[in-house]
């Protein structure tokens, strides 16, 4: 709720994208996300270092559930203040986490 008042420009940009996207495209994208196969095995077998950035207030995918999955496949994770779009909601922290990760690889 707080982000709705502090991020009005970013929210308006997302709304503009949504209202200009044809309904068929929105439905297809939603179904694609819902029906996509589990690709966890791809991450499990990838030998490169991996990082998953999670939003602490994500209402769609609880970070606790994702943290357990990420740890089970040997990935690094960062839990930041923000929701499902944490990279928009907490851009500065996201950039800092990415910079630190890039220094490791």
Give the ranges of each region predicted by the language model.
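Generic structural signal for alpha-helix termini and adjacent loop/cap motifs
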Residues: 36, 104-105
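Conserved loop-alpha-helix segment in the C-terminal half of the alpha/beta-hydrolase fold
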Residues: 45-83, 88, 93
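Residue-level signature of transmembrane alpha-helix interfaces in integral membrane proteins
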Residues: 38, 65, 71, 97-100
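Generic helix-packing signal
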Residues: 33-34, 70, 86, 98
